[in-house]
Amino acid sequence: MAAAVAMRSGSGSDGGGGGYDKAGMDSGKYVRYTPEQVEALERVYAECPKPSSSRRQQLLRDCPILANIEPKQIKVWFQNRRCRDKQRKEASRLQAVNRKLTAMNKLLMEENERLQKQVSQLVHENAYMKQQLQNPSLGNDTSCESNVTTPQNPLRDASNPSGLLTIAEETLTEFLSKATGTAVDWVPMPGMKPGPDSFGIVAVSHGCRGVAARACGLVNLEPTKIVEILKDRPSWFRDCRSLEVFTMFPAGNGGTIELVYMQMYAPTTLVPARDFWTLRYTTTMDDGSLVVCERSLSGSGGGPSTASAQQFVRAEMLPSGYLVRPCEGGGSIVHIVDHLDLEAWSVPEVLRPLYESSRVVAQKMTTAALRHIRQIAQETSGEVVYALGRQPAVLRTFSQRLSRGFNDAISGFNDDGWSVMGGDGIEDVIIACNAKKVRNTSTSANAFVTPGGVICAKASMLLQSVPPAVLVRFLREHRSEWADYNFDAYSASSLKTSSCSLPGLRPMRFSGSQIIMPLAHTVENEEILEVVRLEGQALTHDDGLMSRDIHLLQLCTGIDEKSMGSCFQLVFAPIDELFPDDAPLISSGFRVIPLDMKTDGTPAGRTLDLASSLEVGSTAQPTGDASMDDCNLRSVLTIAFQFPYEMHLQDSVATMARQYVRSIVSSVQRVSMAISPSRSGLNAGQKIISGFPEAPTLARWICQSYQFHLGVELLRQADDAGEALLKMLWDYEDAILCCSFKEKPVFTFANEMGLNMLETSLVALQDLSLDKIFDEAGRKALYNEIPKLMEQGYVYLPGGVCLSGMGRHVSFEQAVAWKVLGEDNNVHCLAFCFVNWSFV
């Protein structure tokens, strides 16, 4: 009886399910495994969750303790064990999703409650206005009640702790009324849709003083960790130059009060930087929530009176901060409010949108903070794995150093050692030198070995009708269009030697080939960190055997076609090929800032939809983001390049730097005209090719030819015509490419998946040829099938590996090529469809 009970109840204690009893295989009852047997099986499972038949046989021979178990029972045990593992992982995933949905639902309920209060308030105001209109005499009522006004809070004495505590408590109250109440009229930020896949709810102010933004979301970190990260503003806010706590004392209620001085970088050479003198109050609420609130102290004379402060305009921070509430089951709900008055009067009128747009504040500060803590949460949980085995914190530090070096060059603060040099009478390029930027010890990360210093040549220019994301992508993908390889080699050589030879002493030639290796990216691809290898070729026989490749560490911001950022950047610095963690960085690059940032408009970084991108000569009005907004888009481009120099070569390097930046400005102007929708007649800057049909016509030819040659439809609703068919082709799940039917086929068209596979854009597509994307085996397979392609009109290619435009390997399961016939039944081009492709 005891044995029978053990057999019936044993299935739950074997760690993975049992096998059939040897004594009664037909009884259908499960065997109860002993703890020793389970331990032996678990050891094997840890090494190999799915052992082969021979491996299971070997297991039975090697473990006498399993001798009484049949191979079939062992197989069933492993099957059950794998099933339980899968169920456990799925249950864990569903629990995490459920926690996120619960927290998001709580946020939405709170937001709904706030909106209901706001609606109620508006209803009362509307009723009052109707009453005023119906009874005009009430508007002139001089009774005591009608003249009641809210008394202004008296100025608090900020010179003693009790006065500061009063200010802190007022700041807390005002901040909470903004974070969870109706003190500010919040409107949803365009393009931000709440939901399980969204990183949070974002809103911007409407009709209040200054500019304000609010964000709230769920983050899988403890509240104390989140507060620690957010208080370290320079670690996540790229525009923050420094933050110094001058005074800190306890508030008496478990909180702390700090007097903080913060400096911000200037976004461009055309405006002065900002600084803040604030009180920061950190405390714990009764419900366990942590609060950090901050506001400017009255008076513009507060804070340190240093020489560097003369280069800043004092801005005001209205009650702002962070509310972090612990969440059931782990994680936290974070509320972030930024409310600033950036003194827009002090900048040229054309640049004032940068200081008068709540959306800019939302993108540069509020959502940046939320994305940063979400990024760290994912890194902490192990969800993010980066190349080269680098730790996420190290790669994040590289991004910060690249950005900080570029900001230092643009702002050129005196206390950093920068001073402006005399010009040549034409004030288009600013030349500044910095003799302090010399590495004397190994701890100075952004300096380097040279007996002189650094020359920085920088310029700013206004752009009209140039999509920022398209421009930055073009500069990234087509370096040979604007860069001089000798100048890259000059900067790179300073990392290896203590001397800085002028370019031209060892003439080099850029092969035109660059290989980009991704290192890291943020959660939503706002930033991409990568290493670029430029292949150089020596022009003299003596240098022929020496490697002349140059490696650059590069940071790209906002190049994603769906980016909604307020800043688009390409920043790079030469590095040693060994790429040590403490590599010195001399940052140079480009920054494009849209000036037409509207809180009620579409994002400046538009999505390049195919219908509007490839129309040639069409008079139809484009739809969606690619409307006339791009033709009227204004932005400011800032260029800054740094060059090391030896003291006796300072003037020569300055002249060289000025001429080089002027040549870059000319190249950028030429590129801008080429990609401008208003000038080229193409909404994405696509070059006009002789004989190239309008996009809807080409889409129809592609689908009709596919059906003609293969006898099946490429698209389910191929009967559609015009832009509807074009949109379906653009959204097709596999990569579709078209190349010219010539001796050297060049790509002329690709759908969205095709552009993603090639890692290029519609602007740069035609610079890729068919032979460049196949390796040797792929080219051989293609050439062998060309006669068959010409004879029957199509051919299937076996799965293999091809190359993207950036040199990355791409595997595909199968490819099909077919001839695309025009209206006259002549071959117009060749089309390829790559099925189930992925990066290796």
UniProtKB/Swiss-Prot annotation:
Name recorded for this polypeptide: Homeobox-leucine zipper protein HOX9
Pfam families: Homeodomain (PF00046), MEKHLA (PF08670), START (PF01852)
Entry comment describing in which tissues the protein is expressed: Expressed in seedlings, roots, stems, leaf sheaths and blades and panicles.
GO terms assigned for molecular function: DNA binding; DNA-binding transcription factor activity; lipid binding
Function, as annotated: Probable transcription factor.
InterPro entries documented for this protein: HD, HD-Zip_III, Homeodomain-like_sf, MEKHLA, START-like_dom_sf, START_lipid-bd_dom
Family per similarity comment: Belongs to the HD-ZIP homeobox family. Class III subfamily.
Coiled coil in keyword set: yes
Species for this entry: Oryza sativa subsp. indica (Rice)
